Amino acid sequence: MSKKMNSTPKKDGFWMPGEWEKHDQCWMIWPERSDNWRLGAKPAQRVFANVANAIAKYEKVTMLVSHQQFENARNLLDQNVRVIECSNDDSWMRDVGPTIVKNKDGEIRGVDWVFNAWGGFKGGLYFPWDKDDAIARKVCEISNIDYYRTDFVLEGGSIHTDGDGTLYTTEECLLNENRNPDLSKEQIEENLKEYCGVEKVIWLPLGVYNDETNGHVDNLLHVVSPGHVVLTWTDDTTDPQYERSKLAYDILTNTLDAKGRKIKVTKLHQPGPLFITKEEAEGIDVCDTMSREPEQRMPASYANFYIANNAIILPIFGDKYDDLAVKTLQSVYPNHKIETVMAREILLGGGNIHCITQQQPTTK
């Protein structure tokens, strides 16, 4: 039976493993919000199904879905995808699900962060968010794993780790006054070390341009292995993303990781830029929080991919840089199959494949 722990992962000898380590399964949540997903979320649901079905070729997938959408999800998903009825507010499993940590014996536990919809009452994207804040605990209870409940606001997409002592994040997100305003940078870093079991935090100034999550690091870069990352890039110095990526590149290439390694940075050219069309904007129900206007630039990125067992599930956009992204990632993941999914519909909702997935590492 799952139980809540009163210590911290670091004190108990647990740490956040690298995402490339073997998984038992992947968790997702079915989309249905009509104020975030166009045309009643029908186009997004088809793409979520494509993502889940692609991952399910390599590892187990569990899809959480509201009771209203259970039959629809079951019909669109392959039979080897497990579907479980579970109340939710939206479908960003990376941000609301548990961060799974492990110890040297292969035991796993979950970290249940506080979720406030990317800002609470100071710029948050929807209200209420209590169902989403309960997702991490529910996942742990379904999986029968113990968990730590923190009093620290954090989304899973705002951190990346190399599984070997180093964590990457952005100041734009974690130091934003709408997350943990009463904590200093040093206190925030201490929380990351205690609950992710890391030794060093590498702070990057900014995420991807116009990212409504306040610059999540998982849209900016992905960790390939200890001492190696792929970084969203553009050579266009007039593009607002250029300065953001250049700042990150300069810090990464002049910083040693927790084990004293120089960090290798592989540039991953961004798509587009891509913009919301008038037709797409008109298909989304108007609300007071989430902005979806015609000609609004979207935070498109190829770094927002999922590492499955022996495969990379990569978002593509029908863009001229799609083939280059596949080639770049195949070069850094020579033993993985690159599975592409047309993912513009996820991008229209504000994120991409990494944002809608959460891995559960294998136990020994």
Swiss-Prot record:
One of its GO terms (biological process) is putrescine biosynthetic process. It is an enzyme of class 3 (hydrolase). Keywords: Hydrolase. InterPro entries: Agmatine_deiminase, Peptidyl-Arg-deiminase_porph. The active site is at residue 355. GO terms for molecular function: agmatine deiminase activity; protein-arginine deiminase activity. Its EC number is 3.5.3.12. It catalyses: agmatine + H2O = N-carbamoylputrescine + NH4(+). SUPFAM superfamilies: Pentein. Belongs to the agmatine deiminase family. This is Putative agmatine deiminase. It comes from Mycoplasma capricolum subsp. capricolum (strain California kid / ATCC 27343 / NCTC 10154).
